[in-house]
Amino acid sequence: MSKRTGSGPTKERFVEETLVLITEQGGSQGINLRQVARRVGCHHTNAYNYFADYDELLWEATRRALLRYAEHLVVGLDDSMPQLDYFRQLVTSLASFPQDNPGLHRFLGAEPIPGGIIPDDVLDTVGRIKTWLFAAFTAVSGSRIDPAEAEDFCNITFGYIEGESIDLINGRVVLGEDIAGRMVKNSVLLFTTLTRAQPGQTYPPPPGGYPKLRLEGAASD
């Protein structure tokens, strides 16, 4: 059977229903093509009109989930924000995505790679998000630390939030504890310490504005 090209409504339904199942079941493990096809309302062999195999469907779902993640990260960011406010909003978004979307977060960052090989375009998308995060952390740091230190600051903050998030989505937290709030509070403390920000002082936004996240199909402001 030859594989069709294009992105018709049936292909879209397969991707969307895959993401719905991932959301409902807390990840992609245990989901199979027959389950997805049942949600679409067709025989599972119909999927091969659009995808070479189930792994290809999962990678298409990964692309869509990454766009949702990118869109989530830029919500509330504005060029007029002082540096600390911009940083606080950014880490709030980093911390709230796993809490709001535990299944998608596990799917994107804590599950086996489909087929063991990451497609080049997915690597490119992940690379663009990381580059933007590095640039954003450099921008909010002003000239108080150099770019290499800002990159370390980004890696430390992101790694900390990821670690807390994995505990959160795996239920390894105290019931009722505001984990996202704690992540933001600790990240802001790290920010003020590493960037040597003076208490009570407002640091204006950079003259050219903050860096923009440019991804096809995702918001950029």
Predicted regions and their residues:
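Amphipathic alpha-helical linker/stalk segments
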Residues: 3-4, 64-87, 135-137
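Amphipathic alpha-helical packing segments from all-alpha helical-bundle domains
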Residues: 116-142, 151-155, 165, 185-192
